[in-house]
Amino acid sequence: MSQDLDQIVADAQAAFAAANDNATLENEKARFLGKTGALTELLKGLGKLDPETRKTEGARINQIKQQVEAALQARRQALADALMNARLAAEAIDVTLPGRAVSRGSLHPVMRTWERVEQIFGSIGFDVADGPEIETDWMNFTALNNPDNHPARSMQDTFYVDGRDSEDKLLLLRTHTSPMQVRYAKMHVEKYAGKAMPPIKVICPGRTYRVDSDATHSPMFNQVEGLWIGEDVSFADLKGVYTDFLRKFFERDDIQVRFRPSYFPFTEPSAEIDMAFGNGKWLEISGSGQVHPNVLRNMGLDPERYIGFAFGSGLERLTMLRYGINDLRLFFEGDVRFLRQFA
């Protein structure tokens, strides 16, 4: 039996060494140490031997079993080490290679314009207000003197939202930031109720939405609207404030501006503001006018006492003019090559 045991050890060591993966190794383990393995069969045969021989051979078989288990464990460790070395080699980093520079982010060009507009108007005493992008039909249209049959109320021009507010008013994505002017003015009036009320001076930048999409229009765009209401604010103030804003924004004193008569439901009189552009061409850059008496009433103000002006400008258009960009869609495509020009 001694020769058989030595052969089992030799066979087990050879079989384990030939196993190139854990699955094969486990199969070889079963051949020697499993329920029907060679060593297990020898242990079962001990019962047929006399007590003295059984004791001697049992000790010998257990010794051989320990040798086989040691060979098995050694091969397991060798396979694990080989797997780890292969993984480390695959994930190795060559520390002599040049490093990758960390790229720096920058403000989007429209956000640069947004911040610049806030800075310019802030320097002459205008507050900055923000409001909800989901507005009520009343706040977006009715409070601003838009009649019920106004084309802007149609689903071809406005994104309506399912559901209504707590007062059963229709909900929509605001088409301009003018609703925030109404909200701000009402809060201003309530704040100074029974007191001497200072003028209302505020700009409202923010995202707005309209059903439109081409090279010069987007269904989502950014707008800034301004409002100045007091007891002696005139159209001349509007011309002075907006002309001064354009000169500071474009950093030019020779900018030519004209106010062209127009119509907007929320202002009377109304004007479109054009800026000289190119070779004798004029480009519309803003809508404006004196706040309509009905809008003043909806703000909680007496139109016989208070007067003021409002204007609204697209931030994308201002950005396009400032940087010479000819396609509005570039702002929304996320092309890093385009955005890096403003880093």
Swiss-Prot record:
Q: Which Pfam families match?
A: Phe_tRNA-synt_N (PF02912), tRNA-synt_2d (PF01409)
Q: Which cofactor does it need?
A: Mg(2+)
Record-listed Mg(2+) binding positions: E268
Name the Enzyme Commission number(s) assigned to this protein: 6.1.1.20
Q: Which UniProt keywords apply?
A: Aminoacyl-tRNA synthetase, ATP-binding, Cytoplasm, Ligase, Magnesium, Metal-binding, Nucleotide-binding, Protein biosynthesis
List the molecular function annotations (GO) for this entry: ATP binding; magnesium ion binding; phenylalanine-tRNA ligase activity; tRNA binding
Instruction: List the record's Gene Ontology CC terms alphabetically.
Output: cytoplasm
An example GO biological process term is: phenylalanyl-tRNA aminoacylation
Q: Which InterPro entries match?
A: aa-tRNA-synth_II, aa-tRNA-synth_II/BPL/LPL, Phe-tRNA-synth_IIc_asu, Phe-tRNA_ligase_II_N, Phe_tRNA_ligase_alpha1_bac, Phenylalanyl-tRNA_Synthase, tRNA-bd_arm
Kindly list any coiled-coil regions of this protein: none
Its recorded reaction(s) are: tRNA(Phe) + L-phenylalanine + ATP = L-phenylalanyl-tRNA(Phe) + AMP + diphosphate + H(+)
Principal cellular location given in the protein's record: cytoplasm
SUPFAM superfamilies registered for this protein in UniProt: Class II aaRS and biotin synthetases, tRNA-binding arm
Places the protein is found: Cytoplasm
The record's comment on cofactor binding reads:
Binds 2 magnesium ions per tetramer.
Q: Which family does it belong to?
A: Belongs to the class-II aminoacyl-tRNA synthetase family. Phe-tRNA synthetase alpha subunit type 1 subfamily.
Quaternary assembly:
Tetramer of two alpha and two beta subunits.
What's the name of the protein?
Answer: Phenylalanine--tRNA ligase alpha subunit
